[in-house]
Amino acid sequence: MKGGKRVQLTRPNRINSEIRAIKVRLTGVEGDQIGIVNLREALKKSEELGLDLVEISPNAEPPVCRIMDYGKFLYEKSKSSKEQKKKQKVIHIKEIKFRPGTDEGDYQVKLRNLIRFLEDGDKAKITLRFRGREMAHQKIGVDVLNRVKNDLIELATVEYFPSKIEGRQMIMILAPKKK
């Protein structure tokens, strides 16, 4: 390909002939300290063992290098990072919308959904929207939010409870209780 840019592979660690130091602090396969040796000598030792010389800490004086199987090292590193990602729980905020005049049947359905969200470990955002003349009856809206809060007292803790109306809505945020 004419005039194309070459893609250069960059490794997180320099290995074997990529190491630029004259002397290195060498550690063995099991992590035992060998000492400060000449780079050629360190490369020779790693070749004898059939392993790679990997620069672990390039900013140290002299740089710290370790004799190891670099492919295996990268595999173990990626495996451990995948394990850490698996253990992380992503918390989503699920939203349920109420109105001041939400009827009993609808209220129960929405409450059931809130319970499901909280049991799954997600946060819940309860939005209470006012329309038209409902703005004059904000107390009814606060009563609805208090009812939701009291119905979910065993499952959730209130992270945010509105002190006043924001625009045409009130928002309450619930977080699941720690088990």
From Swiss-Prot:
Cellular compartment(s): Cytoplasm
UniProt xrefs under Gene3D superfamilies: Translation initiation factor 3 (IF-3), C-terminal domain, Translation initiation factor 3 (IF-3), N-terminal domain
InterPro entries per the UniProt record, alphabetical: T_IF-3_C_sf, T_IF-3_N_sf, Translation_initiation_fac3_CS, Translation_initiation_fac_3, Translation_initiation_fac_3_C, Translation_initiation_fac_3_N
One annotated Gene Ontology cellular component of this protein: membrane
GO MF assignments: ribosome binding; translation initiation factor activity
PROSITE patterns: IF3
GO biological process, one term: ribosome disassembly
Major localization class: cytoplasm
Keywords: Cytoplasm, Initiation factor, Protein biosynthesis
Similarity section: Belongs to the IF-3 family.
Subunit structure, interactors included: Monomer.
HAMAP family found in the cross-reference section: IF_3
Cited PANTHER family: TRANSLATION INITIATION FACTOR IF-3, TRANSLATION INITIATION FACTOR IF-3, MITOCHONDRIAL
Name of the protein this chain belongs to: Translation initiation factor IF-3
Source organism of the structure: Buchnera aphidicola subsp. Acyrthosiphon pisum (strain Tuc7)
Gene that specifies this protein: infC
